[in-house]
């Protein structure tokens, strides 16, 4: 009817009315021939009625539909049904939804982790999105948290799956006193935005506005964050914007089925990454659509969940400059401009938010980013492992500090081998066999780590001398590269060991 849609405004019109919007203009200016919405509100029946058939707004490049007479307290599942005449029909969820239903994995989530989950609809096909008009407003006990040591925080990197026996955000909440008493200033959660499946490191994201149900409900995440704030600890999210999986709606909407990757006309993704580090589908960060999406997502996480900062994964890949292994770390002015833009967006939403990049580029580029107030990961694993094993060669700690203390130094991370394991395998003399000696060596490492000015990060259980390999299986009985991202042994019993507890 010629109505123009503002895709930036809230889609909740009133207590019973919602407008859904789907942008589908490709890089050549083309769009799908038709679009419908299937959902609980129309019994998943494909019709040309006003509660199913979407209207076209060419000026905005999108399809839209307004749904009336809805129940404000009910969760509605829905999908878009789009296609071209004589071509492929696609059913996909909404990229901006805050909850999804996954028929292949939801049944594996324990009720204790996600109670009363909405049942998957009979009319659905694949992942479906969910909305509810009336938001579940959360009563924050600490509405305006401020970090105690923003310049030199001690950050604890945590993977929820491998931190407690129930693998959940609620389980982690029960351990906050342990972390607080240890002196932790901030907890950095490995990716918790919806990823493919339930068992993952989380670097395979598909829905960025929904937090993964495998760890808990939105309220449980907020309970955890609020409890951290009450205890004086910040919460940092590890976010992945270098890429997304093929389940991400922006990827599915413009997909090359023959080549099993994003199509050439996709306005969000590259068909092939210009850099050598990509996995899954590579975002084109020079696209205004991608920039807008990422900024909107960052602001949402800051506002809705009161996150205190972000660790950006693989920022070296935020570029359209073609490179190889030999040149990817070279100074890239275009990449710097993109990253500064995202940093500015975070600061505009929350002026005291921490921004950390996993960058690993040449010194000039990292120094320019550091001058903006951005922190950068500084990998000291090799040197500290050498020291832990009792070997002098390559054990220098000089790379931990620069005149500008913007490097987040770490001895271990989720992505590096554990010092305790290396001690048992390649330690010098008695270090291989004697636990008290190993622990004393790790304590010496800590003394030459935490006394250096600047932000510091420790990997979970490193404080107890965790000595299972990064490539260990769940039982700790086998070590192989195939187990790298698999579940790991959870050893809270270490804390009952007087020698380990001393560390």
Identify the residue ranges that each predicted region occupies.
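Active-site-proximal helices and loops of the catalytic beta/alpha 8
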Residues: 193-194, 199-204, 229-231, 314-416, ...
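Extracellular/periplasmic catalytic domains that process cell-envelope and extracellular macromolecules
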Residues: 28-30, 71-72, 147-152, 180-181, ...
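Non-catalytic, glycine-rich low-complexity segments
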Residues: 1-31, 121
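Substrate-binding/active-site clefts of carbohydrate-active enzymes
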Residues: 97-101, 110, 115, 136-150, ...
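Aromatic-rich carbohydrate-binding modules that target alpha-glucans
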Residues: 20-73, 83-105
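Extended, polar beta-sheet/loop recognition surfaces of beta-rich domains
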Residues: 86-142
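Aromatic-anchored helix/helix-loop segment that forms the rim or "lid"
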Residues: 422-446
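Exposed beta-strand face motif in extracellular beta-rich ectodomains
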Residues: 74-78
């Amino acid at each position: 009817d010629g109505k123009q849609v503002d895709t930036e405004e809230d889609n909740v019109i009133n207590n019973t009315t919602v407008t859904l919007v789907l942008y589908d203009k490709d890089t050549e200016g083309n769009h799908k021939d038709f679009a419908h919405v299937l959902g609980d509100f129309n019994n998943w029946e494909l019709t040309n009625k006003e509660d199913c058939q979407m209207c076209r707004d060419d000026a905005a490049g999108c399809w839209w539909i307004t749904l009336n007479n809805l129940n404000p307290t009910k969760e509605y599942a829905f999908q878009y049904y789009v296609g071209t005449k004589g071509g492929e029909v696609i059913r996909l969820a909404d990229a901006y939804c805050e909850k999804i239903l996954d028929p292949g994995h939801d049944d594996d989530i324990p009720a204790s982790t996600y109670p009363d989950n909405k049942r998957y609809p009979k009319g659905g096909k694949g992942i479906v999105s969910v909305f509810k008009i009336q938001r579940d407003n959360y009563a924050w006990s600490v509405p305006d948290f401020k970090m105690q040591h923003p310049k030199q925080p001690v950050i604890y990197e945590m993977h929820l799956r491998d931190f407690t026996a129930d693998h959940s955000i609620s389980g982690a909440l029960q351990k906050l006193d342990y972390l607080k008493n240890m002196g932790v200033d901030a907890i950095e959660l490995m990716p918790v935005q919806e990823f493919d499946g339930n068992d993952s490191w989380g670097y395979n994201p598909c829905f960025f506005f929904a937090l993964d149900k495998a760890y808990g409900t939105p309220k449980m995440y907020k309970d955890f964050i609020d409890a951290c704030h009450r205890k004086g600890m910040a919460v940092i999210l590890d976010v992945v914007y270098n890429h997304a999986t093929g389940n991400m709606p922006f990827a599915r909407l413009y997909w090359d089925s023959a080549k099993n990757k994003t199509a050439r006309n996709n306005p969000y993704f590259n068909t092939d990454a210009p850099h050598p580090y990509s996995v899954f589908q590579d975002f084109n960060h020079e696209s205004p659509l991608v920039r807008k999406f990422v900024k909107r997502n960052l602001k949402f996480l800051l506002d809705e969940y009161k996150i205190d900062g972000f660790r950006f994964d693989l920022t070296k890949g935020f570029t359209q400059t073609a490179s190889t292994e030999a040149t990817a770390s070279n100074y890239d002015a275009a990449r710097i401009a993109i990253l500064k833009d995202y940093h500015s967006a975070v600061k505009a939403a929350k002026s005291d938010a921490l921004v950390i990049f996993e960058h690993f580029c040449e010194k000039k580029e990292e120094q320019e980013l550091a001058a903006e107030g951005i922190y950068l990961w500084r990998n000291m694993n090799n040197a500290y492992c050498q020291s832990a094993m009792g070997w002098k060669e390559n054990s220098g700690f000089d790379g931990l500090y620069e005149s500008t203390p913007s490097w987040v130094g770490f001895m271990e991370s989720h992505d590096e081998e554990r010092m305790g394991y290396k001690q048992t395998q390649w330690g010098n003399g008695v270090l291989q066999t004697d636990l008290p000696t190993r622990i004393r060596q790790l304590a010496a490492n800590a003394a030459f780590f935490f006394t250096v000015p600047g932000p510091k990060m420790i990997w979970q259980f490193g404080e107890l001398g965790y000595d299972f390999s990064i490539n260990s299986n769940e039982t700790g009985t086998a070590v192989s590269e195939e187990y790298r991202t698999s579940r790991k042994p959870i050893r809270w019993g270490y804390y009952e060991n007087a020698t380990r507890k001393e560390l």
